[in-house]
Swiss-Prot record:
<feature type="binding site">
    <location>
        <position position="152"/>
    </location>
    <ligand>
        <name>Mn(2+)</name>
    </ligand>
</feature>
<feature type="binding site">
    <location>
        <position position="13"/>
    </location>
    <ligand>
        <name>NADPH</name>
    </ligand>
</feature>
<dbReference type="GO" id="GO:0030145">
    <property type="term" value="F:manganese ion binding"/>
</dbReference>
<feature type="binding site">
    <location>
        <position position="126"/>
    </location>
    <ligand>
        <name>NADPH</name>
    </ligand>
</feature>
<keyword id="KW-0560">Oxidoreductase</keyword>
<dbReference type="InterPro" id="IPR013512">
    <property type="entry name" value="DXP_reductoisomerase_N"/>
</dbReference>
<dbReference type="GO" id="GO:0070402">
    <property type="term" value="F:NADPH binding"/>
</dbReference>
<feature type="binding site">
    <location>
        <position position="10"/>
    </location>
    <ligand>
        <name>NADPH</name>
    </ligand>
</feature>
<keyword id="KW-0464">Manganese</keyword>
<feature type="binding site">
    <location>
        <position position="37"/>
    </location>
    <ligand>
        <name>NADPH</name>
    </ligand>
</feature>
<feature type="binding site">
    <location>
        <position position="217"/>
    </location>
    <ligand>
        <name>1-deoxy-D-xylulose 5-phosphate</name>
    </ligand>
</feature>
<feature type="binding site">
    <location>
        <position position="150"/>
    </location>
    <ligand>
        <name>Mn(2+)</name>
    </ligand>
</feature>
<keyword id="KW-0521">NADP</keyword>
<feature type="binding site">
    <location>
        <position position="199"/>
    </location>
    <ligand>
        <name>1-deoxy-D-xylulose 5-phosphate</name>
    </ligand>
</feature>
<feature type="binding site">
    <location>
        <position position="152"/>
    </location>
    <ligand>
        <name>1-deoxy-D-xylulose 5-phosphate</name>
    </ligand>
</feature>
<dbReference type="GO" id="GO:0051484">
    <property type="term" value="P:isopentenyl diphosphate biosynthetic process, methylerythritol 4-phosphate pathway involved in terpenoid biosynthetic process"/>
</dbReference>
<comment type="pathway">
    <text>Isoprenoid biosynthesis; isopentenyl diphosphate biosynthesis via DXP pathway; isopentenyl diphosphate from 1-deoxy-D-xylulose 5-phosphate: step 1/6.</text>
</comment>
Amino acid sequence: MKNITILGATGSIGTQTLDVIRREKEELKLVAISANKSDKKVIEIIKEFKPKYAVLMEENAFKIVEDFCIDNKIDTKVLKGMEGMIYISTLEEVNTVVTSVVGMIGLVPTIKAIESGKDIALANKETLVVAGELVISKAKEHNVNILPVDSEHGAIFQCLRGNKKEEVKNIIVTASGGPFRGKKKEELIDVKPEHALKHPKWNMGRKISIDSATLMNKGLEVIEAHFLFGVDYENIKVVVHPQSIVHSMVEYKDGSVIAQMATPDMKLPIQYALNYPNRKESQIEPLDFYKISNLTFEKPDMDTFLPLKLAYEAGKKGGVMPAILNGANEVAVDLFLKGKIEFLQIGDLLQECMNKFYKSMEATLENVISVDKEVREYLGKKYDI
């Protein structure tokens, strides 16, 4: 029996993780959850799974859930804030922590979980982007597995199993291309949030949907891949594959290319990470090759989708530059969703902050938190938020 903590249990990945646990109750047990402010969803999870702990970040939501548990004599202990997240990430009885919260908020709980010897099922891209070197070194120090919970890195992880790192020539990360694949800059001038949120293949949260539309999501995945698999940026390629059947590939020195293919469904990489190193009976629709008419691959347009280009630049620069990129992007996406900036301004703001805030500093926990704060305060004052 594996005991699981889910950070971000009410979001897209968290909800699908609950689906996996629901179907594997004999082998997976939900011990603790966290959420931001979705008190109604948390109450439903408590009623069904009866976790020992539930954490709410928002004060009012915390009180609602706490009162519900007291009034209904439910044993779930309700905690709040970052302190609560760290507590449930370091519980002695927990084997695996699923980090599916969005943004920098997942960084400290993830590091604390690693230091407590927990395997990490990582769906929070920002953790590796801003502090990849620190996270990977901590994982090695504490003999912890970092198991990627996204289709691309989960695919690469599988393609690398049983092979030697020195035999790898290139990692090929596939991208659907998002809702604006094939568009040029002039066609994206009047894009509204509702257009950018309509992803052609995946059902995702609002922030990651915008990242997919700008291709920033793929840029973050490139930086993640660098840290997860120890491959230079020159050997990490992005290929647009609109059918989303090939989830990523590894090219070896002898010319062989190993690809992982499956129906596009996030439950597969979640299930693989939770059950690693074993494979379980599929919870998704099997791939039917007779129904696949064609598979196509294209080069990404980095001029139109500037954030992907900037992610490569930030990754190669190293140090705190990925943290600057990430902090600026989180604020820029929020500004776009609130109608305060245009779609194409997202890339412009990333470029502006990378130029303004870069310092030759090691990516320690203190440094990345400090520079992230500087970027957010600057953009907050600029746009009065």
